[in-house]
């Protein structure tokens, strides 16, 4: 059986943790930041765990993660 290819778009967006979960970047921190509070912007800078409903899709895109 041939090797499975990693979807590079997903590899750039997600990072696997040691426990098998995936981390992702949060949305809404690219532009239009003037009206957001410093606390909001600081929180948006942290990583978030991919929801359990999406884990299977991410795993299929990154078979060796």
UniProtKB/Swiss-Prot annotation:
Record keywords: Ribonucleoprotein, Ribosomal protein
Nucleotide-binding among keywords: no
InterPro entries noted in UniProt: Ribosomal_bL35, Ribosomal_bL35-like, Ribosomal_bL35_CS, Ribosomal_bL35_sf
GO molecular function, one term: structural constituent of ribosome
The keyword Ligase appears for this protein: no
Gene3D superfamilies, per the entry: 4.10.410.60
UniProt GO cellular component terms: cytosolic large ribosomal subunit
A Gene Ontology BP annotation from the UniProt entry: translation
Family of this protein: Belongs to the bacterial ribosomal protein bL35 family.
Annotated protein name in UniProt: Large ribosomal subunit protein bL35
């Amino acid at each position: 059986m041939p090797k499975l290819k990693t979807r590079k778009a997903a590899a750039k967006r997600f990072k696997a943790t040691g426990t098998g979960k995936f981390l992702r970047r949060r949305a809404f921190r690219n532009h239009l930041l003037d009206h957001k509070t410093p606390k909001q912007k600081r929180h948006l800078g942290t990583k978030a765990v991919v929801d359990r409903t999406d884990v299977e899709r991410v795993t299929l895109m990154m078979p060796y993660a």
